[in-house]
Amino acid sequence: MQVSVETTQGLGRRVTITIAADSIETAVKSELVNVAKKVRIDGFRKGKVPMNIVAQRYGASVRQDVLGDLMSRNFVDAIIKEKINPAGAPNYVPGEYKVGEDFTYSVEFEVYPEVELTGLESIEVEKPVVEVTDADVDVMLDTLRKQQATWKEKDGAADAEDRVTIDFTGSVDGEEFEGGKATDFVLAMGQGRMIPGFEDGVKGHKAGEEFTIDVTFPEEYHAENLKGKAAKFVINLKKVEERELPELTEEFIKRFGVEDGSVAGLRAEVRKNMERELKGAVRNRVKSQAIEGLVKANDIDVPAALIDSEIDVLRRQAAQRFGGNEKQALELPRELFEEQAKRRVVVGLLLGEVIRTNELKADEERVKGLIEEMASAYEDPKEVIEFYSKNKELMDNMRNVALEEQAVEAVLAKAKVSEKATSFNELMNQQA
């Protein structure tokens, strides 16, 4: 076997291989012997068919199969010998073949980039230092009560957190526009559902009032004909309702799994959940900064084949989220996923090099801790832990999570890490 390797462009490689004629003939004869043992031909017993008849009937197809097998095996031998690491599926380009002559073919593919990590010492990471305070717990309890609130009609003016029922008609330059009119529209104030200025224009008015407000559509508004346009809305305010928050009664508290129904028990449960969320948020914040720094410090070429493969993964995930099938997934425009796919491939290659250079392996104690932490959010943690322990795929996924964490920690060990006091609310809003 003769082998030559050339660089086509960037990460592209072409391996040209020549297989000696005698190697081909030896393999063909060997395969014909195997075929002769199995075939049945009228007039001959099984395994007793003369070789010349077997060759006459099956020689062409056997030769084709043998060539395909030799091309594959010789390519594998070549990349092992040349220490080449292909990325993605290779493209075989066969040359002209004549029986009794050497056979030359080429294989085109991309290789993984040679990653040499640099700049880890210059990465800056700001680690949030946060405590869950009693005030944070109070806010969360209010949120829980608001989620369970009922609405009661009131006579006064609409406030920032009230709910209103309105009719409205919008116009731009005196002309009504599509989607700018509604009847008995129920609007919960303070959720940012409407364009800027709309809710402010409703606040302070009472049921039974009709009034006009002036607003401006944002420049990034989805409707092209309305971007940045000044508009008027004629509004008929039909009903104003305010929230009635439930009291922290024993019955209410037990809805959240607090068996003794006490306020102290509810506060303890809420605090525990908030601290679990906080731990994850801090970890994610630090991780995202470390990875961002790693990417900025290491500009690497990325094999197109890996990006294409990642795009297909993202397409399928998107289709699953919205109830689509395989065919619909592959029809989604690649432009929607290209940037994210490239980013994921780059991060994977860089973290892979961190893992390789630091000789990291998944820490089983960390894996166990991650599963226990995740399971604690469920009603029966033991059942979840047992379910994971019996599922190889889930366990492998969690090992990958642990290994990624260990890689990030290896980056952080060399990075410049500082601490910054932050509130619970500020950190969680950054995560949103």
UniProtKB/Swiss-Prot annotation:
GO terms for biological process: 'de novo' cotranslational protein folding; cell division; chaperone-mediated protein folding; protein transport; protein unfolding. Residues 161-246 form the PPIase FKBP-type domain. Its main location: cytoplasm. One of its GO terms (molecular function) is peptidyl-prolyl cis-trans isomerase activity. It is found in: Cytoplasm. Keywords: Cell cycle, Cell division, Chaperone, Cytoplasm, Isomerase, Rotamase. It catalyses: [protein]-peptidylproline (omega=180) = [protein]-peptidylproline (omega=0). PROSITE patterns: FKBP_PPIASE. Disulfide bonds: none annotated. GO terms for cellular component: cytoplasm. Pfam families: FKBP_C, Trigger_C, Trigger_N. Its EC number is 5.2.1.8. Belongs to the FKBP-type PPIase family. Tig subfamily. Consists of 3 domains; the N-terminus binds the ribosome, the middle domain has PPIase activity, while the C-terminus has intrinsic chaperone activity on its own. This is Trigger factor. It comes from Salmonella paratyphi B (strain ATCC BAA-1250 / SPB7). The gene is tig.
